[in-house]
């Protein structure tokens, strides 16, 4: 564990040090390959054990009504271990496949970390999926467990299969309540089996733009290590407050709202808006001292409908990046004129981490 942590940190720190010297970073960087690497145990828990980082917010979610919920690294580490212990008690074992369909809520991050610790393979799913979509994913994904919000449990009523059903929120007849996880042992978690390295970590379904969605596999080593490139592209640093506009269930959410910021020991900020409100988002970004921002072109096109110049002195932004599709030069120029920051494009796929980007 100590060696895995040291290898990962050494590679991470090199990318932080050489962030502005691309040629040197290319020459010096060697992806770490620690044996049986389990990112949640060997990286996240070790980072959370540090007094300074442990007290830092790992996640902060701001709701539309202005209420917020923050979770420190130390609390997230402990709570995810508790959830892992509870998942074990209801039958989850290494290699099982769990379909995770939640919105931007704390339980999403807890569960994903818990599954990584256990070696349970996560199949992320967007809440936009229909019962027919879910039937297909559960069948082709060989799903053993489903964890979703109570409000979405009804989508599974007509979905056949012998799988554990866990509901987050109000009780649902026939479903196990996620709230029961608080009764599990809060300390002393030890994974029943070693999971890591080349073991499967995530199974994503592609978007299915031109054909039926296909399954894509990522391992415990390939995905977290791969997202060191995503961290480098975004320009994340320890202590940053990172805001990513993305929906859970898609790979971009794991990119920029999970692995990349936590690789950097940054705070993940989530702003839940039923309908996008550019002025409210800018106000929240100023209030929360957001330093790094990632969004699809659609968001940037709506942001430039605002007069950005007055925000220039109020925002703490250092980096702005876009992904999903190329940005129009006119949009990039308008943001630069208003905020003094050049939006940098990046490209990757469900099958990869960040592949190409303006650094």
Where are these regions (language model features)?
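ANL superfamily adenylate-forming
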Residues: 63-66, 145, 151-197
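Conserved AMP-binding A3 loop
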Residues: 69-74, 201-225
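Conserved AMP-binding/adenylate-forming core of the ANL superfamily
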Residues: 55-113, 130-135, 220-221
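Conserved helix-loop-beta element of the AMP-binding
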Residues: 142-145, 160-173, 240-243, 269, ...
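Conserved pre-ATP/AMP-binding loop-to-beta segment of ANL
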Residues: 54-57, 173, 183-205, 212, ...
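Conserved AMP-binding/adenylation subdomain of ANL enzymes
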Residues: 224-241, 248-291, 306
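Conserved structural elements of the adenylate-forming
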Residues: 77-85, 197, 216-237, 245, ...
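Gly/Ser/Thr-rich phosphate-binding loop
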Residues: 263, 290-294, 304-359
């Amino acid at each position: 564990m100590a060696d895995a942590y040291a290898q990962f940190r050494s590679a991470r720190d090199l990318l932080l040090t050489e962030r502005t010297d691309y040629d040197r970073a290319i020459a010096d960087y060697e992806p770490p390959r620690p044996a049986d690497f389990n990112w949640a145990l060997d990286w996240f828990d070790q980072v959370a054990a540090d007094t300074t980082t442990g007290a830092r917010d790992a996640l902060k979610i701001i709701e539309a009504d202005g209420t917020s919920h923050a979770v420190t690294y130390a609390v997230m580490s402990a709570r995810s271990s508790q959830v892992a212990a509870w998942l074990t008690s209801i039958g989850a074992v290494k290699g099982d496949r769990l379909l995770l369909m939640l919105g931007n809520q704390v339980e999403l991050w807890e569960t994903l970390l818990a599954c990584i610790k256990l070696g349970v393979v996560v199949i992320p799913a967007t809440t936009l999926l229909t019962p027919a979509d879910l039937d297909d994913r559960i069948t082709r994904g060989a799903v053993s467990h489903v964890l979703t919000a109570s409000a979405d449990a009804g989508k599974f009523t007509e979905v056949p299969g012998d799988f554990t059903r866990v509901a987050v929120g109000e009780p649902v007849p026939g479903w196990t309540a996620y709230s029961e996880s608080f009764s599990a042992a809060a300390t002393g978690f030890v994974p029943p089996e070693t999971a890591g390295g080349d073991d499967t970590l995530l199974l994503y379904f592609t978007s299915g733009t031109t054909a039926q969605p296909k399954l894509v596999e990522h391992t415990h080593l390939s995905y977290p290590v791969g997202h060191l490139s995503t961290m480098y592209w975004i320009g994340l640093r320890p202590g940053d407050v990172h805001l990513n506009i993305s929906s859970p269930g898609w790979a971009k959410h794991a990119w920029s709202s999970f692995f990349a910021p936590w690789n950097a020991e940054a705070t993940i900020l989530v702003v839940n808006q039923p309908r996008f409100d550019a002025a409210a988002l800018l106000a929240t970004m100023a209030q929360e001292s957001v330093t790094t921002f990632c969004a699809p072109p659609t968001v940037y096109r709506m942001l430039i409908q605002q007069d950005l110049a007055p925000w220039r002195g109020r925002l703490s932004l250092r980096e702005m990046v876009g992904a999903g599709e190329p940005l129009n030069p006119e949009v990039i120029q308008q943001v630069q004129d208003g905020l003094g920051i050049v939006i940098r494009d990046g490209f990757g796929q469900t099958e990869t981490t960040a592949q190409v980007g303006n650094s």
